[in-house]
Amino acid sequence: VLLPSHPGSDADQQKDLLSGAAAPPNPEELRFRPLDVSALLDGVEAGTLLVGQQIAIDDVAVVGHSWGATAAMQLSGLQTTSRKLKTRCQDLRDPARNLSWVLQCSWLSGADQESLADPRVKAAVVVSPPMNLLFDESSGPSLQAKVLLVSGTRDWVVPSDPEAVVPLQGGKPLANGHRLVLASG
């Protein structure tokens, strides 16, 4: 198991953000998180990390929660876009608006970027990913890894309907082998 640390968007930064001592993370952090994971995989592949371990580096599963889940989606092949961020972040009366939008809307200037997919990632477990504004529903076919998305019905930060259920409506992602687990509570 590799557990990356993401300076600039780690637990200390989140604590400072919630206390009002810091602004949301720099939009560039949206790109840095998946690149951090790919760099760790490169280190294992090059033999500079976990030396002497037998690791199938070409068959990797990633797991992420919240923003880490967003990074896992990027590593799995979804590409971020500012299309919805540009219009919906300005609408304070949007009925789907939720607390996760604070983070998603802070990514506006960093959203349009090249794919950060890592071909070594074959599966992803993503828990409560803020994704409704950040990814287009049409980007599902670009997923190269199988994704298990887990969301809770009482998650008030990243609510399941707008952030998990709505992006998967239409059946295409589910028809391609991806799965949604909607936990009651």
Question: Which residues does each PLM region occupy?
Answer:
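Conserved alpha/beta-hydrolase
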Residues: 1-13
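Alpha/beta-hydrolase active-site loop
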Residues: 22-57, 74, 84-102, 110
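Residue in the alpha/beta-hydrolase core beta-strand immediately N-terminal to the catalytic nucleophile
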Residues: 59-61, 123-125
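Gly/Ala-rich beta-loop-alpha elbow adjacent to hydrolase catalytic centers
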Residues: 64-68, 72
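Acidic beta-to-alpha connecting loop that harbors the catalytic carboxylate
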Residues: 67, 130-131, 153-156, 184-185
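Conserved alpha/beta-hydrolase "acid-adjacent" motif
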Residues: 135, 156-163
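Short beta-strand/loop motif that positions the catalytic acidic residue
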Residues: 143, 149-151
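Catalytic histidine neighborhood in serine/cysteine hydrolases
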Residues: 171-185
